[in-house]
Amino acid sequence: MIISSEIVSAEEFCNFVKDIGGYIPHLGASRGGVDKGESSVWLGLLDEDMIHEMYSDRDVAEWEAKLGAAPQIIVELRLDHSPRAKLLYLWVAFIFGTKWNSILYDVNGELLSYAQVSGRYQEFGVEW
């Protein structure tokens, strides 16, 4: 999941998803997806209230320390099982981080700064 210290409205989120070639299932939704080749990533926006309902104070404090500010939103990411799905979700996190201060809690349970996300993505040298 992507964790950001910036407030991202549902409209901004939807525009982001569409700008990267993704889709929104219906007007006003705060979820969508991105398909590239045979890989898909589903994205869902959670606001600050949902963060505190769904996650422990300890988790939130850890994210705040890594972000340098309190988390305001989470973008949940769900991947398919295709060979390049992890690369696609890393690309989504990389592009998101160019717009908003963020970190990534990756599929291996590791908390990555944007610099680490950027480095890992650039290692692959893939352009979508």
Each predicted region: which residue ranges?
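Acidic (Asp/Glu-rich) sequence patches and key acidic residues
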Residues: 1-128
